[in-house]
Amino acid sequence: MNYPTYESDFESMIEAQRQWSLQTFGPTTRLAGILDHLRKELDEVEANPSDVSEWIDVVILALDGAWRQGFSPVEIVEALRAKYAKNRARMWPDWRDADPDKAIEHVRNEATR
C-alpha cells in the first residue's frame, strides 16, 4: 500500500499518521481499543523508560485518539499550543519538594480552574 509521507511540520505528520491509521485500523473511533493499547504501551514504558520508541508509541496513540474524536491536525496542534501556554501560566510547586514517584500537579485555586 502507498502511504502518504510527511513534511517537516507536525500537522503534516499527524495527517500522514491519520491516513495510515485509517487504512490500517478502519474509520471508527476505536476508543476502547486505543485506551487498551495505551495501557499496554504505558506498561512497556515503565519496563523500559530509556527506550524513546516506547514513549513515541504513547504519543502516536494519543494523537490517534484525538483525531478519531473528530479533531483535525490543525486543531490538535492548536490544542497542544494552548495547553502548553495554559501550563506555563499556572503556578507549580517546587519540584525539589515533590515525591519523585508521584505526579507534580499545578496549584489548584479558583483562578486556575
Predicted regions and their residues:
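Flexible "arm" and connector segments at domain edges
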Residues: 1-113
